[in-house]
Amino acid sequence: VAGPPASGSRPPEAATVPRHAGAGSEATADVLVLGGGIIGLVTAWRAVGRGLSVVVADPEPGGGAARVAAGMLAAVTELHHGEEALLALNLRSANGWESFAAELEEAAGTGLGYRRCGTLAVALDADDRTQLRELHALHRRHGLESRWLTGRECRRLEPMLAPGVRGGLRVDGDHQVDPRRLGTALVTACERAGVDFRRAAVARLTERAGRAVGAELADGTRVSAGTTVLACGSRSSTLEGLPPHARPPVRPVKGQVLRLRVPPAFAPFLSRTVRAVVRASEVYLVPRENGELVIGATSEERGWDTTVTAGGVYELLRDAHELVPGLTELPLVETCAGLRPGTPDNAPLLGPGPLPGLQVATGHHRNGVLLTPATGEALAHSLSTGVLPDWAAPFSALRNIEQAIRDSDLG
């Protein structure tokens, strides 16, 4: 999970974890993955599939920001002006999700809650309608499939929508998955494939002669590795022992999320993900196949604070109620908050970084679940060959350094 409630500007300290059978021991592997969220896990699973020996260090594998996420696979409806470069990566990953889900479900022997249900983005007033029309035009310029619907057509698709809905975009290719089930399945698949889990927090990176050679864990274990992968999410830049020049430009972006339950008497409540911009804030409602309804999410620059606030809950319920008034009758079963790993350009940092022996898989911001298949594919390639595949090169962990060099040359 993202962590206990905390406030202030300092990152959370490494958790004290119980010693286990391997505590204080030595371990060696081809690859050491620091962080057992979905990005670290998919990296480990794909790497071991390439014949590499892999250790994952994390006190609670399968946790992280994805435990809070809604799990939208929204490459089309999440397209923002100025982020067109990210579109190709998002689409590649979205198009690979069906086969990835089938492969992972077979490997883990459990479902992921993957649903090919589509998404409906709606407008509540004239300004929202104009903004949605602009998004539709952006889709058309990029050859993306979305269909404009009138308010009446939107309500015909989703009868629970408010009468005031003015129009919408139907995107049948934007699906969803349950991130909690995804994390559980990845842990199981990794274990079955032979990944060595060390359930302890990472104390510090180990560096020798200017090269990353592994890490020390909070329980005293020392892990040596040919390549170490930094996959610590929003905390990736805070790792002890990481030289300043090798710290990725990642910051925490807080998101609060609500989980409601749809009783059988109210089912079916929504058949697909519904989203909108209300009062300049994005809100979405994601119906799970198990009767859960996820409402999210705030986007807050609050440092390391993961407190669920009355204001955050109020804003989410208020905005969601404007879309679907009937949700006020549903039981509220969970409130939670997590920290997305944000980057200056909202795009992930992948592959070899400035420190030899260290590769990076972080900075996925709001697209971590969507980009799980593509990240696993890219990191498996870079761990096997030393370089990213061509299609992932624009998201190199070195791109900020390379851009700074180009800027200095121009200056």
Q: Model-predicted segments: where are they?
A:
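Active-site substrate-recognition segment that forms the wall
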Residues: 42-49, 59, 71-72, 110-114, ...
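N-terminal Rossmann-like FAD-binding beta1-loop-alpha1 element of flavoenzymes
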Residues: 29-55
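Dinucleotide-binding Rossmann-like beta1-alpha1 core, especially the glycine-rich loop
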Residues: 72-153, 157
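Helix-loop-beta segment of a Rossmann-like dinucleotide-binding subdomain
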Residues: 110-123, 135, 142-193, 298-302, ...
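C-terminal catalytic lobe of FAD-dependent flavoproteins
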Residues: 324-411
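Helical element adjacent to the flavin cofactor pocket in flavoenzyme catalytic cores
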Residues: 169-219, 223-225
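Short hydrophobic core segments
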Residues: 32-34, 223-235, 376
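Extreme N-terminal leader/targeting segments of oxidoreductases
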Residues: 1-30, 49
